[in-house]
């Protein structure tokens, strides 16, 4: 359906919703690369004006693409709850999510009444402060071996990657993270090698570490989900099943992923937990996403990268995950060119994920050839912590020596918790107090004494081979 707007004597015509949404998006290198971005700021403003007048039911009447992701989104929509808002426009949805009463309405059922396309449309007519204000009161609480997402909780994934998957190196980095109070979200390793044997070894090592120190958290080895399932069949203790996902069927095919395969993986991991101790909930999936991933595998189908990202959240929502995070800035300047685009994408992704009911975290990061620096990550970290982000990354020294990109460090996460008055997951914080790493809700002197504290802590896990 065509839509047109006349702005200062110039008429802009948009052939369909897909084109309208792409033109209304904030500047993104990926959209420019795909040839779908607005050609001028005036066209962008005109598109935003037209998009604000689109009724929400149009996103069901005019699907952007016909594929299995669209089918999943439509079938999982709470149509009864949607009936109450179907005639609202995108602009009216923006106004609704910014009201003080919205969080209560959202909790009572509106979070199931929105499709990713609706949420993505609202995001592109919101300011940075709007995105933060709307997301902050929305909480998505999940349980695996601890409880994530409660009000005031800022979780941290410990990411102890190693360029050769050296077990001692991985565990030493993980212990370093624990001493900073990090690791409540997950101790998650990206393996340098994707062999079954390597994944099995890493799964056992992380499990043994968690058992040895008695920390209430979960581990994950971020290999392809099929590799993790093969490791599970060989006896590996899989706490969380990880997979990168996209917002179109073609993108997921490029990742070697099917919706049926994810469903079968979920059931396999849940079944494996029946015979293991320590689990307090059934949220066992961990998904990563990121603006630009669909374009990177030529699977976007003409849809802009913000909308593709939101649709990936539609996939994630169907599997009731424990964690979801956008790796904002990871795939480079071809998709997010600079600090401005990275910061905007991080706030958009967090808002969209939260509005769709996800336990949303952000890997606040950049590659070494993009126009950004550690001030970028500092600023976005503070903004997201203020906006109620579920979790962020903890990377030793901010520099991932295996993936070769820059993220947030253990000390960054600890510092921003203190700055905004956030805390770890409750079970994890209790363990921190018991071990002396925390004292009165803050890092203790024991944790601040550097190598001596690390040496003292590792004495309890000598049997792991450190």
Regions picked out by a protein language model, each given a short descriptive name:
Residues 1-171, 179, 184-466:
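Anaerobic metallocofactor- and corrinoid-dependent redox/one-carbon enzyme cores
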């Amino acid at each position: 359906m065509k839509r047109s707007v006349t702005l200062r004597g110039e008429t802009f015509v948009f052939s369909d919703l897909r084109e309208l949404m792409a033109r209304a998006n904030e500047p993104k290198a990926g959209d420019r690369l795909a040839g779908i971005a607005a050609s001028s700021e005036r066209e962008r403003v005109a598109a935003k004006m037209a998009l604000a007048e689109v009724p929400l039911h149009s996103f069901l009447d005019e699907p952007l693409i016909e594929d299995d992701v669209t089918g999943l989104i439509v079938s999982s929509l709470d149509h009864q709850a949607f009936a109450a808002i179907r005639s609202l426009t995108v602009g009216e949805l923006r106004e609704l999510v910014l009201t003080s009463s919205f969080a209560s309405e959202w909790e009572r059922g509106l979070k199931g009444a929105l499709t990713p396309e609706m949420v993505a449309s609202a995001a592109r007519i919101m300011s940075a402060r709007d995105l933060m204000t709307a997301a902050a009161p929305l909480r998505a609480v999940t349980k695996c071996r601890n409880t994530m997402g409660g009000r005031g909780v800022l979780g941290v994934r410990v990411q102890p990657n190693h360029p050769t998957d050296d077990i001692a190196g991985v565990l030493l980095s993980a212990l370093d993270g624990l001493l900073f109070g990090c690791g409540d979200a997950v101790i998650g390793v990206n393996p340098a090698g994707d062999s079954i044997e390597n994944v099995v070894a890493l799964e056992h090592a992380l499990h043994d570490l968690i058992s040895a120190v008695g920390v209430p958290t979960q581990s994950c080895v971020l290999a392809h989900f099929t590799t993790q399932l093969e490791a599970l069949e060989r006896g590996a203790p899989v706490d969380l099943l990880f997979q990168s996902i996209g917002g179109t069927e073609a993108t997921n095919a490029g990742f070697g992923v099917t919706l049926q395969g994810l469903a079968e993986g979920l059931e396999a991991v849940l079944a494996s937990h029946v015979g293991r101790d320590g689990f307090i909930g059934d949220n066992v999936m961990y998904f990563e996403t990121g603006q630009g991933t669909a374009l990177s595998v030529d699977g976007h189908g003409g849809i802009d990268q913000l909308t593709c990202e939101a649709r990936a959240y539609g996939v994630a929502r169907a599997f009731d995950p424990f964690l979801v995070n956008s790796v904002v800035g990871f795939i480079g300047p071809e998709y997010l060119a600079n600090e401005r685009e990275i910061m905007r994408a991080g706030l958009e992704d967090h808002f969209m994920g939260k509005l769709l009911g996800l336990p949303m975290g952000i890997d606040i990061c950049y590659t070494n050839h993009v126009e950004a620096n550690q001030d970028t990550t500092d600023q976005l970290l503070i903004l997201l912590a203020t906006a109620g982000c579920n979790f962020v990354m903890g990377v030793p020294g901010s520099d991932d020596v295996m993936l070769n990109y820059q993220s947030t460090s253990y000390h960054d996460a600890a510092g921003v918790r203190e700055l905004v008055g956030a805390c770890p997951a409750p079970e994890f914080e209790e363990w921190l107090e018991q071990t002396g790493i925390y004292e009165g809700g803050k890092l203790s002197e024991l944790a601040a004494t550097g190598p001596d504290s690390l040496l003292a802590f590792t004495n309890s896990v000598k049997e792991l081979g450190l």
